[in-house]
Amino acid sequence: MSLPLTRKDLMIVNMGPQHPSMHGVLRLIVTLDGEDVIDCEPILGYLHRGMEKIAENRTIIQYLPYVTRWDYLATMFTEAITVNAPEFLENIQIPQRASYIRVIMLELSRIASHLLWLGPFMADLGAQTPFFYIFRERELIYDLFEAATGMRMMHNYFRIGGVAADLPYGWIDKCLDFCDYFLRGISEYQQLIKQNPIFLERVEGVGFISGEEAVNWGLSGPMLRASGIQWDLRKVDLYESYNQFDWKVQWQKEGDSLARYLVRISEMRESIKIIQQAIEKIPGGPYENLEVRRFKKAKNSEWNDFEYKFLGKKPSPNFELSKQELYVRVEAPKGELGIYLVGDDSLFPWRWKIRPPGFINLQILPQLVKKMKLADIMTILGSIDIIMGEVDR
């Protein structure tokens, strides 16, 4: 009896950059043997906008509106790292009230980011119902952002030395109401998702990363903590006022896609706990340190008529960055978001290097999808949680 011939020819498939499950303009060149993945090559750069070079030709205040376009689902964190870099470089003190407001906004933004990860992730796996529930809760967070900052997404709220405006009257009560409501919502998500056998079949044991691999690849955030590494910059670096609150680092030891899901769900609960404590302990006082505003020195104090027409009477609140260098980081929803800043005794940074967590975490994707099925690519890529605006910069 003749045996059937085995297929030796491989198929090369382009996934993206327009595929809806690519979470942006990501392109994957996938080599397949039937349904089995032999190789996967991510192609990046479709959303590159030169964010680092733009920063080196702007003052920090002028650059703030740009940074919300990195990770446009967690804009508070990109603003926070942008103002933290010059604050640490020049040793600028932050009023206690401003620090508490920052913590509240950062944790609300973390919840919103995790929600917008969870909805499309479940949709990629074939579950449409959680997608609509999650957008309902996310709109409540955006209502809080709009009331405090005037914008629902691109907030432009953080300032060097504090925040742009104080919390409006009645905002704290609305935030507490949301916290109570959302805690019940998380329990609903768990009942709806965690007990679903189809969901468990798709994520359990898929995309395994050991703790040693996670460290060697430089992973951070839920990708690192889901592999058994208890590393959270809010505990390690003690920035803002996180050391004044009682909360725990959420982690899992399994290292698969299910563990990454559980870490993010648990982080949303911890964020609610931090917000409630911050609202309870929030002090009075100023919301911005106005003394940090060092106005640009005019080289020639006697302006002629032509220059006066084009220069406003009140210059923008710029200040010089001294000739130093430092690296500053925050714990963003997707991992460690860092800035390497080099000052040069001028208003513009000499070097502004962005360390995006999504770009680093994405590098392990080819290793995770090899020897897996084609359908598992969506599960693994979704569990990494990337935003291409941040990856390409």
UniProtKB/Swiss-Prot annotation:
SUPFAM superfamilies: HydB/Nqo4-like (SSF56762). It is a peripheral membrane protein. GO terms for molecular function: NAD binding; oxidoreductase activity, acting on NAD(P)H, quinone or similar compound as acceptor; quinone binding. GO terms for biological process: photosynthesis, light reaction. The keyword Thylakoid applies. Keywords: Chloroplast, Membrane, NAD, NADP, Plastid, Plastoquinone, Quinone, Thylakoid, Translocase, Transport. It catalyses: a plastoquinone + NADH + (n+1) H(+)(in) = a plastoquinol + NAD(+) + n H(+)(out); a plastoquinone + NADPH + (n+1) H(+)(in) = a plastoquinol + NADP(+) + n H(+)(out). Belongs to the complex I 49 kDa subunit family. NDH is composed of at least 16 different subunits, 5 of which are encoded in the nucleus. This is NAD(P)H-quinone oxidoreductase subunit H, chloroplastic.
